[in-house]
């Protein structure tokens, strides 16, 4: 009888010790910080698959496909890159901006994009660029396949302050353009495959 009691006691004690050990191990993995300084943070799955990178400009990787960088390139931004279940880049949030040796503002803006599976091109893009060479603020939707990337929808405004919605055909040619100029004049233009306006609607003057 005593032997059975000792066996049961030993089993219970072993179970409790194991539970406390596992709980202590799990608790040790959770740490709290008020502030962290880092050049780059990699987020990985338990099997090591890369899922997200938060990085400064110097450490931002090139395009990574299935865990391999092809090839390393210098991207003039800092930001956050997203990777799918296979460790292939499929979007990101990047930002930058500085003055070059001539005092011109270059690479200034922010871009949130998502890539189509199996293609290193963006099919959804929310961009804001404002530097010495370019100014664009808008939402861009594109078709992507083996033949390239073709813009289909643009909603935004340009450096002249014209707000517009552009609808393109499957070849990326603009076919419908809705615009409102800075002075408030609206218009709808219909274009042929060569980009020529074939019909246009504007405001009707009151009599």
Task: Show which residues each predicted segment covers.
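Parallel beta-helix/beta-solenoid repeats that form elongated, surface-exposed shafts/blades used
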Residues: 20-207
């Amino acid at each position: 009888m005593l032997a059975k009691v000792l066996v049961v006691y030993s089993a219970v004690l072993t179970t409790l010790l194991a539970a406390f050990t596992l709980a202590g191990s799990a608790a040790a993995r959770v740490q709290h910080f008020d502030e962290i300084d880092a050049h780059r943070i990699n987020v990985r799955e338990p099997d090591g698959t890369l899922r997200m990178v938060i990085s400064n400009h110097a450490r931002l990787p090139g395009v990574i496909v299935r865990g391999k960088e092809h090839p390393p390139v210098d991207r003039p931004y800092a930001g956050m890159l997203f990777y799918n279940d296979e460790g292939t880049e499929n979007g990101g949030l990047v930002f930058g901006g500085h003055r070059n040796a001539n005092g011109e503002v270059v690479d200034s803006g922010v871009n949130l994009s998502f890539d189509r599976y199996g293609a290193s091109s963006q099919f959804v893009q929310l961009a804001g660029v404002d530097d010495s060479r370019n100014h664009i603020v808008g939402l861009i939707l594109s078709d992507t396949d083996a033949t390239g990337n073709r813009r289909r929808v643009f909603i935004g405004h340009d450096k002249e302050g014209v707000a517009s919605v552009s609808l393109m055909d499957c070849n990326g040619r603009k076919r419908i353009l809705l615009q409102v100029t800075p002075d408030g004049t609206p218009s709808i233009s219909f274009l042929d495959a060569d980009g020529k306006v074939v019909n246009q609607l504007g405001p009707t003057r009151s009599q």
